Amino acid sequence: MRGFLIALLTLSSGAFAQQALVIPDTLSGKTFNLRMHKDSVQWFQGKITQTLSFNEYKYLGPTLILNKGDEVNISVKNEIGDTTTVHWHGLHVPAIWDGGPHSPILDGETWKPNFTVLDKASTYWYHPHFDKKTALQAIKGAAGLIIVRDKEEAALTIPRTYGIDDIPLVVQCKQLDADNQAMPRGMQDSTVMVNGVINPFVNLPAQFIRFRLLNASGERSFNFGFSNNKSIYVIGTDGCFLKHSTQTTRVRLSPGERAEILINLTGMNSQSLYLMSYASELNMGVQGGPTMPMPPGSPPMDSPLNGIDFNILKIQVVAQNINAITSIPSSLVSLSPYEEKNASTTRIINITAKDSLTMDGPFYFNDSTFDMMRIDYFIPLNSIEIWSITNKSMVAHPFHTHDVQFYILDRDGNPSPERERGRKDVVLIEPNETVRIIMKFEDHADTLVPYMYHCHVLMHEDDGMMGQFMVVPANSSSIPRVEKSTFALYPNPSSGRVLIDLNNVSIKPEILVEVYDSKGLHLMSIIEENSNNKSLDLDLSSLVDGLYFFRINGQNYKYIKAN
């Protein structure tokens, strides 16, 4: 299948005719080439919708298949007319290749990360992560799935024929404006799609089917279930398989969360059922649940989908395949959750807002908004930590950590549901709830580039609900705990000539400017006499375009050179 265009098919009632679910193509191997570009689709009558996508696609991108232990090389070409990044959501990679806001890809440039796949078999994804533009770019469609395979998963007798009995489902809900353009702040979202298809159907054989569920919405949580409350067998969380499959009828996923589930269609040939969201069962305060009463002057948040049950995907059951999977194993994989007694540190994070009635943000971690120049936590390599996150706001927040997967210790002191007891990187924290997570920071240390933690409601993230941690060598007691640099460099980005504001730099006979590239390589030192000038004019046009780190009299700053 090559670049798909969602055809406009309407009924006289204005409803969408059902359309076949599109299964994204896969890319596999050890070398991957991605090209992020502008495109468009015709979802509704009238103006076409402008999108961002990867490779030949008009919306979303291919599914990347990685094998644990492989060293992979990825090339990402930016052709969107703006700066972006690509974050490998859930993957345990070095900070320099994580794709956070410190790894900008300038328009027309190519970013070439390479790393060894250290993750367990599961479903991950990739999407933009540029500061203050994540929602704008991701909501337009710049995203795709990542499947990691390993030997443990390969030994299990479970469905794994991609597109036949192993089905990727990228579920989104978005708000379009009067011109049919996706709105990054979609609090009245009502357009539900799966793999970029509105009102989709899929033909599936009468046997066990594996769904890889991703909630790629900007803010809406889904309470997944099937019509007639058909049993769901949860086999995997964000970052691994569970020890045993867990039977349930509901799987709640907030933005960024994934789950791997099985359903048994044996004996259902010629029957139909629906994947649904039972949003009427979500608690108030969870975006997608019943709309909360709003204080005067608040923006509208009354999506017609809030608090109601609705269909997402129609499943039409067809004849069973040869070699069909008709049972599931009693046990899956071994897990070794970290023990609380081995934690060296407990960090307290409070989710706050400007006042108790705030519904639309901004929201904060410990009353602080995101600052690229502030490192919130320095974490020694190989340490095990507990993070206790308390939501003191009126709305639920999906809390996401980069770099590592965590285990949920408890929710308000109670064990989490069995389906949440695998490795995770996103956890939904409801109003007035405290969730404790435990994680180990291993393999990757970097004293220049931090990792992020943030809310995965994208407009909350872009409004500053994000913090940074840096994993440092265990013996790095000399790493300075600088909360914020006392000098400023501008314009940033620039084409090469920059002005450094020295108003708050400590007075010394000489001013030492040191420049490093994004890999920590020292490029140059510039020594200037301190003539009591309040600024320093530097010509850095000899540097190639990219990300640079400055140290001025021992203080750190980041700089992006762009033409």
Where are these regions (language model features)?
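C-terminal outer-membrane/trafficking sorting elements
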Residues: I6, F16, P480-Y490, S494-N563
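Active/binding-pocket-proximal capping segment
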Residues: S227-G239, K392-G422, L458-M459, V471-P473
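Histidine-centered copper-binding motifs that mark active-site loops
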Residues: Q18-P255, I261, N283, M292-D355, ...
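Short glycine/proline/serine/threonine-rich loop/turn segments at secondary-structure transition edges
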Residues: A121-W125, M268-L275, H444-M452, G546
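C-terminal substrate/ligand-recognition segments
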Residues: R347-I408, D425-L448, H454
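A glycine-anchored, Pro-Gly-centered beta-turn/N-cap motif
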Residues: S122, Q207, S383, V449, ...
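Short coil/turn motif common to extracellular beta-sandwich-like domains
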Residues: N67-E71, P205-F208, L381-I384, N492-L499
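Bacterial Sec-dependent N-terminal signal peptides
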Residues: M1-Q18
